[in-house]
Amino acid sequence: MTRKLVLLRHGQSQWNLDNRFTGWVDVELTDQGCQEAVAAGKLMKDEGLQFDVAHTSVLKRAIHTLQGALKELDQDWLPVSKSWRLNERHYGGLQGLDKAETAAKHGEEQVKIWRRSYDIPPPAMDVDDPGHPCHDRRYATLDRNALPGTESLATTLVRVLPYWHDAIAPQLKAGQTVLVTAHGNSLRALYKYLNDVSNEQILELNIPTGIPLLFELDDNLQVRSFRYLGDPEAAKRAAEAVANQGKAK
């Protein structure tokens, strides 16, 4: 039996448009981002996907993308689970900074390492910073020590995997079709795990906003195939645009 999983990065956010490091900052979708959510829903509808359950983060850009896609799918009723474990990677002291200006200051290669390397985190955010997640009530029930002040992709994967094993994988094994709407780096972490991508190869992986990535898995959740829905060239161009965000102007 083939199990189907769709990974969907949220639509364009205001800080995507502004080319700023976002991380755990809770920013809105742009009008284009809202349109991308609807377009993602249409692509999934055209594919004939009938979901049983959906998962998303606790950040509104992912939540609103999921809502827009489900409305287009006419599957608004779908059970939705939200978890902080699907949040974007925490960008530490880089959050809020302009990516191009940061590249001009520190060099494009350093910014690429911070953005795309596997195990090197950006400079940490101080726990006394008002933006640290320990001051956000949505995380009030969590162990303060579990809340990051910065993350690498490696530590993001460590955060995401328990949710995969405890929540998503059992549903897939039960034969359910699952939609996960999350963020560039939490989805890169899942992609790395599912496809057994090396630490070096993951550096070059960029996930575009608003384009569903369909995985077909076997009974043991091993990947049989995966592809972006819609025009492959459009997905390629969108991924290249993501890669270019960390370059100096």
UniProtKB/Swiss-Prot annotation:
InterPro entries: His_Pase_superF_clade-1, His_PPase_superfam, PG/BPGM_mutase_AS, Phosphogly_mut1
Glycoprotein found in the keyword field: no
Top-rank lineage group of the source organism: Bacteria
Active site per UniProt: 10 (tele-phosphohistidine intermediate), 88 (proton donor/acceptor)
SUPFAM superfamilies for the chain: Phosphoglycerate mutase-like (SSF53254)
CDD domains: HP_PGM_like (cd07067)
MF annotations from Gene Ontology: phosphoglycerate mutase activity
Keywords: Gluconeogenesis, Glycolysis, Isomerase
Binding residue positions for substrate: 9-16, 22-23, 61, 88-91, 99, 115-116, 184-185
Pathway field: Carbohydrate degradation; glycolysis; pyruvate from D-glyceraldehyde 3-phosphate: step 3/5
EC number(s) reported in the record: 5.4.2.11
Catalyzed reaction equations: (2R)-2-phosphoglycerate = (2R)-3-phosphoglycerate
GO biological process, one term: glycolytic process
Site positions per UniProt: Transition state stabilizer: 183
A Pfam family reported for this protein in Swiss-Prot or TrEMBL: His_Phos_1
Enzyme class: isomerase
Protein family membership: Belongs to the phosphoglycerate mutase family. BPG-dependent PGAM subfamily.
Record function comment: Catalyzes the interconversion of 2-phosphoglycerate and 3-phosphoglycerate.
Complex formation: Homodimer.
Listed NCBIfam families: pgm_1, PRK14115.1
Protein name: 2,3-bisphosphoglycerate-dependent phosphoglycerate mutase
Lineage, uppermost ranks: Bacteria, Pseudomonadati, Pseudomonadota, Gammaproteobacteria, Lysobacterales
Gene for this chain: gpmA
